[in-house]
């Protein structure tokens, strides 16, 4: 059994750790509430953008490769969103596992793009070359960050460096659950956007001037940026939720460990007192007998 001094030292160390994790939990809780509100505000915009894309795509020709795709897919670009910082449980591990699995499933060569220092470090450790990398904003992204990433991914497609572009990120469900998903950005084909569905947005018919193809050429890059923006917000909310949950669990575990160590210390102190009393009693008996 450890000595009383060692137990006291361990208890103090664990208490110090609990203070740190509790503070991190409080900070993450504040950031999480802000990030969650941004996700809820941005979702309707992203959904409306998809409605507009469906309406225009239904009226456009299929000659535009950014909409219809290319005949042969030789290379795909895979953009993965991770966090800049750790202490967020399995948040990064699960999206990176999903990325590796998706890359292995592709019949074409995979071109990797990474956002977040954790993802960048992961791919460099595995010696996977990065076509582009972004960092320094994952916990509080701006629309300008989404534009940089979106424009970079669009350039890869326009220059024919990639024939398809995919985005892998953690979709926010709740503070304890983030679901890794794969979304195709280019060719841009929103669900339900097949030709012949009619040019309507929320039931309202539209005429496109000068024509749907011209509008589509200008809208697709903005559509990609919108999807990236939504993904960045979802990932940020998931990161703060995961960190808040992880720090709460760490604090709870630390408090339980303090209770366990305190019980051990009390038992050790009781044993020491009992031993000292026994020694005093034995000494008294020896003196009386002498």
Swiss-Prot record:
This protein's UniProt keywords: ATP synthesis, Cell membrane, CF(1), Hydrogen ion transport, Ion transport, Membrane, Transport
Entry keyword Cell membrane: yes
Membrane topology: Peripheral membrane protein
GO cellular component, one term: plasma membrane
GO-annotated biological processes: proton motive force-driven plasma membrane ATP synthesis
Molecular function GO labels: ATP binding; proton-transporting ATP synthase activity, rotational mechanism
UniProt KW Acyltransferase keyword: no
Function description: Produces ATP from ADP in the presence of a proton gradient across the membrane. The gamma chain is believed to be important in regulating ATPase activity and the flow of protons through the CF(0) complex.
Assembly and oligomerization: F-type ATPases have 2 components, CF(1) - the catalytic core - and CF(0) - the membrane proton channel. CF(1) has five subunits: alpha(3), beta(3), gamma(1), delta(1), epsilon(1). CF(0) has three main subunits: a, b and c.
Family: Belongs to the ATPase gamma chain family.
Protein name: ATP synthase gamma chain
Organism expressing this protein natively: Rubrobacter xylanophilus (strain DSM 9941 / JCM 11954 / NBRC 16129 / PRD-1)
Chain's gene name: atpG
